[in-house]
A protein has these predicted regions:
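Flexible, active-site-proximal loop/turn residues at the rims of small-molecule/cofactor binding pockets
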Residues: 87, 99, 116
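A short, conserved alpha-helix within the catalytic core of class I
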Residues: 90-102
């Protein structure tokens, strides 16, 4: 499903890695692993931060990376997939489900974090080509579980972890 808002302009922090890369539980899962960051933006701060704990991060972003780069990333296989601050900038549940299912094709463990905005639960357009859901992390649980039948989906504070059932 095509996204109505590309969220290209939401990749704005070139100096600080997304919070998921410093969350204790997420760091423990990623340490020493290969990681694909789905919708990771135009900057490499995530890869740089994760190198400290031995994780090798490849970033896929259809709006901020070249088609050649993205094809090479998707050709790989990974231990962990990260979706950080992505679901909250997509205005369609179907498109959010597509992102989650893409991540699930690349790794058996997903780490998902969202920016909660004002926490009102009322999504709104924030710029010409940008959207913010303003939903709390817990509010994404049902739709993530629906997108991942046969997976265990659990929330740990502001982190959602999904793992394939074995």
């Amino acid at each position: 499903m095509k996204q109505r808002f590309t969220s290209k302009q939401t990749s704005i922090n070139g100096t600080k890695a997304p919070a998921v890369y410093s969350m204790k539980r997420a760091v423990n899962v990623m340490t020493g692993k290969t990681v694909v960051d789905i919708g990771g933006g135009r900057f490499d701060t995530a890869a740089e931060a994760a190198r400290v704990y031995g994780a090798a991060v490849s970033i896929y972003d259809p709006f901020n990376r070249t088609p050649e780069h993205n094809a090479a990333v998707l050709a790989g296989s990974y231990d962990v997939a990260v979706i950080s601050n992505v679901l909250n900038v997509i205005d369609s549940e179907a498109a959010r489900g597509d992102v989650v299912r893409l991540a699930a094709t690349k790794a058996a463990v997903l780490l998902i974090a969202v920016y909660e905005g004002d926490g009102s639960g009322t999504g709104r357009q924030t710029a010409a080509d940008s959207w913010q859901e303003n939903r709390r992390t817990a509010d994404y649980m049902d739709e993530i579980a629906a997108a991942l039948p046969g997976w265990n989906v659990a929330r740990f504070g502001r982190l959602i972890q999904a793992t394939q059932k074995r």
